[in-house]
């Protein structure tokens, strides 16, 4: 581990030199590449340097104990050694986590797709609850959220809502929301007070850059149509809505949220690019040895990941067996406890795999 950390430290210093080289500064591609490489390793290098400083202090303090010290001085040095030993252990644990394989998509912005699934009106109302939950969570994280496409119902639910989330680490946290979310509650329309079970699905796609997904114009069929409101009635006499079909994959994306056809096409392209990128990622993931996969499901969208039980005010994440009696707070966007628990669990699994 320490050989690897030392080579990272040396590479970091070399990147410092390269980033001040006029030849690199004049080459925007190299400048971007080296800047990203340095940014990716910065935290690891800084923690490693802190660890080396603590180790030096620890060794010096241990050597002091070998000198003839009075009782008071001996006690002070012993206390310092204990504190440094604790810091050393904490930094070692942190370095182990920092050296774990990183998801290359973690720093990306995301496209989130929420759909009402089994349960009719109630599933669509729950899809709206999930959208509000993510919007509040994004706001608390300082991320920007933008609706790309929404198919709303007369009761205020969503058959489907697609939105982008832009901000530092958006994918690294929201990727754990991939899957089927189940709700158990008494619907507002239920006169007998019976609890119904409904489901909404969530897909979280890393937003792809143009350079990552090469889409040729000849591979896209563009259809335009008049946008419609809840229930399907036409609300726009101009042909501003856009449907894009990617012919090689059969992926179809529609957008009618904007009044401008150009803006709708831009938004639809963003979703199309993300879906194509995600398709390739899913195919590549399927080829991996099953034993290398994380135990925390972040890929299978048919997997039931969480249950929201309203009568008992309980939320259970089935992947790690976490149950919280905080349903109202979670629906208000307070997802940190769940997501942090999933991250810690995944890190533990990755460490176990590395040891094996």
UniProtKB/Swiss-Prot annotation:
Q: What does this protein do?
A: Peptide chain release factor 1 directs the termination of translation in response to the peptide chain termination codons UAG and UAA.
Q: Which residues carry this modification: N5-methylglutamine?
A: 233
Q: Does the keyword Protein biosynthesis apply?
A: yes
* Record InterPro entries: PCRF (IPR005139), Pep_chain_release_fac_I (IPR000352), Pep_chain_release_fac_I_sf (IPR045853), Prokaryotic/Mito_RF (IPR050057), RF-1 (IPR004373)
Please give the name of this protein: Peptide chain release factor 1
The record's annotation in Gene3D superfamilies points to: 3.30.160.20, 3.30.70.1660, 6.10.140.1950
Question: Can you say where in the cell this protein is located?
Answer: Cytoplasm
The Swiss-Prot or TrEMBL record describes its family as follows:
Belongs to the prokaryotic/mitochondrial release factor family.
Q: Which GO terms describe its molecular function?
A: translation release factor activity, codon specific
Q: How is it modified after translation?
A: Methylated by PrmC. Methylation increases the termination efficiency of RF1.
Highest taxon above the source species: Bacteria
**Cytoplasm among the record's keywords?**
yes
